[in-house]
Swiss-Prot record:
Belongs to the FADH(2)-utilizing monooxygenase family. GO terms for molecular function: monooxygenase activity; oxidoreductase activity, acting on the CH-CH group of donors. This is 2,4,6-trichlorophenol monooxygenase. InterPro entries: Acyl-CoA_Oxase/DH_mid-dom_sf (IPR046373), AcylCo_DH-like_C (IPR036250), AcylCoA_DH/oxidase_NM_dom_sf (IPR009100), HpaB/PvcC/4-BUDH (IPR004925), HpaB/PvcC/4-BUDH_C (IPR024719), HpaB/PvcC/4-BUDH_N (IPR024674). It comes from the Bacteria. It catalyses: 2,4,6-trichlorophenol + FADH2 + O2 = 2-chloro-6-hydroxy-1,4-benzoquinone + FAD + 2 chloride + 3 H(+); 2,4,6-trichlorophenol + FADH2 + O2 = 2,6-dichlorobenzoquinone + FAD + chloride + H2O + H(+); 2,6-dichlorobenzoquinone + H2O = 2-chloro-6-hydroxy-1,4-benzoquinone + chloride + 2 H(+). Keywords: Aromatic hydrocarbons catabolism, FAD, Flavoprotein, Monooxygenase, Oxidoreductase. The gene is tcpA. One of its GO terms (biological process) is catabolic process.
Length: 517
């Protein structure tokens, strides 16, 4: 099945319980605070029906059925790059990567489960014989068959971190009952993006020291399940599509979800009860989402560089050497992001399930590079724009007979039409000088773990002790022999988790003298 936008919008009127700010939403597809972003999801599905994009947006599976590329499995480097082109096409067609949580991103998270489902069964505690690897396989096939949007929601409420017993008293989601048919859960998942627009909630957990086993839940449930309430922040969507060409296209709506005695059948439970298993998956479940994040960041960097070129050409400063060197920063930033993507793909490896996976160290440190520098890049772009990013005529002002001539003269430049400068300014304003744009800024800083967490968690994905590949050359130059006790905790990491990392492949490269990373 290749879902249409119309089918998607009709599916949203299913009785789901959604709040946006102070308003209860009767129908996500039609309410003024949600309908624009619902339409963006409909546009996403309709992209797959465009004849000119058929080979990019769809594929024919092994059963001979054409499906959307979000379900495409990549088993070699070229197939991975084909998947990247698919993601990039969506970003370029939908507001220059301004919507980070489209269905293709959400569903990519399921790849980690389906690649090696057996540990999720064997490592379960307290539900042996009930939680089966087959549950994962069946659910992913079900989602693929119906072309669903399964939004992940993993983050739990912040607690008093000075209190060692805080996790025990957390209102975070937990199992309160198990029976022959399934489990009953209650509690809160504190952050999720676009959950109000999804078909299913993909429930997971980020390990925290002291987390009790009853809070370790990996499962799925429909958004309209009785007892589920999605509580979104207030909307920052703008109404006028001319004045706000991007901010009027919709708001993804981050929010929390309250689960009040929600029943989940065993068939939709993927794992329960084991904090040590959950400890291995803060990044590994989201590896594919993080690869997608780097693609998005590359497209965003390209957009920023392009906007800098457009605005400096239009105001006539592009030939000034000092301006050229500043524009070069933005172009170099994009090239650096692109280099991380290409290198991660080039130095990828095969997972236990046979998928070709990009090098996680390269793309995760690429994400860190973006977060470390993109604030400065935004500053450069806005500063290069001068007043053009903030002070410009509204459309009615521009069209006023008495004012138009003045505006034409004020915005006349060496290239393009005077009104083009207003169009460029509106986009820069929406992206970087509105609450809608600031929400994107905050999202980029914190989704999929913030900067310091990226570094910390990535350092747990390979051997970074003196016994590892980074220490090999240094020990040789220093004339130091390797002794016992140099191994880090990574050596003790479960083999099934290490198999999802690129560390083994990199160690072989390092030991053969090919390269360090």
């Amino acid at each position: 099945m290749i879902r249409t936008g119309k089918q998607y919008l009709e599916s949203l009127n299913d009785g789901r319980n959604v709040w946006v700010g102070n308003e209860k939403i009767d129908n996500v597809a039609t309410h003024p605070k949600t309908r624009d972003y619902a339409q963006r999801h409909a546009d996403f599905y309709d992209l797959h029906h465009r004849p000119d994009l058929q080979d990019v947006m769809t594929f024919v599976d092994k059963d001979g059925e054409r499906r959307t590329m979000q379900w495409f499995g990549h088993y070699d480097k070229e197939q991975l790059r084909r998947k990247r082109k698919y993601h990039e096409t969506i970003m370029r067609e939908m507001a220059g990567a301004s919507f980070p949580r489209t269905p293709d991103v959400n569903n990519y998270v399921l790849q980690t489960y389906i690649d090696d489902p057996s540990p999720w069964e064997t490592q379960t505690i307290g539900a042996e014989g009930k939680v089966k690897a087959k549950n994962i396989v069946d659910f992913v096939n079900f989602a693929k068959k119906h072309d669903l949007n399964c939004a992940p929601q993993f983050v739990d409420p912040q607690m008093d971190r000075s209190n060692p017993d805080a996790q025990q008293r957390s209102p975070g989601l937990r199992v309160i009952e198990k029976n022959d048919k399934g489990i009953v859960v209650s509690g809160v998942k504190a952050i999720g993006t676009g959950v109000a627009f999804a078909d299913w909630i993909h429930i997971g957990v980020f390990f925290r020291p002291g987390i009790p086993g009853d809070q370790i839940i990996f499962a799925a449930t429909p958004v309209n399940t009785p007892g589920v309430t999605i509580v979104c922040r207030e909307s920052v969507v703008k109404e006028d599509p001319i004045e706000h060409p991007l901010a009027s296209q919709g708001d993804e709506l981050d929010g929390m979800t309250v689960f009040d005695n929600v029943f989940i059948p065993w068939s939709h439970v993927f794992h329960l009860g084991n904090p040590e298993h959950a400890k291995l998956y803060p990044q590994r479940v989201f590896d594919w989402l993080h690869y997608h994040a780097l693609i998005r960041q590359s497209v965003r960097a390209e957009l920023m560089a392009g906007l800098a070129i457009l605005i400096t050409e239009h105001i006539g400063t592009n030939k000034i050497p000092a301006v050229q060197t500043r524009v070069a920063k933005l172009i170099g930033f994009h090239q650096a992001m692109l280099a991380h993507i290409v290198a991660s793909e080039e130095l990828g490896f095969h997972t236990p399930g046979g998928a070709y996976k990009p090098n996680i160290l390269i793309y995760d440190f690429g994400r860190a590079l973006y977060l470390e520098n993109f604030s400065q890049m935004i500053y450069e772009l806005v500063d290069l724009s001068g007043r053009s990013a903030l002070i410009f005529a509204s459309e009615d002002q521009w069209n006023d007979e008495a004012l138009n001539g003045w505006f034409e003269r004020m915005n006349n430049g060496p290239v393009g039409q005077p009104h083009d400068r207003v169009k460029i300014g509106r986009v820069i304003r929406d992206l970087f000088l509105t609450d809608w744009g600031n929400r994107l800024f905050v999202f980029e800083n914190f989704n999929g773990t913030p900067l310091q967490a990226i570094r910390m968690l990535t350092m747990q994905r390979a051997e970074f002790s003196a016994a590892g590949p980074y220490g090999t050359l240094a020990r040789k130059v220093c004339g130091i022999e390797l002794t016992e006790g140099h191994d880090s905790e990574y050596k003790a990491t479960a083999g099934y988790a290490q198999a999802l990392d690129s560390a083994r492949h990199q160690e072989k490269l390092a030991l053969s003298g090919t390269m360090t990373v």
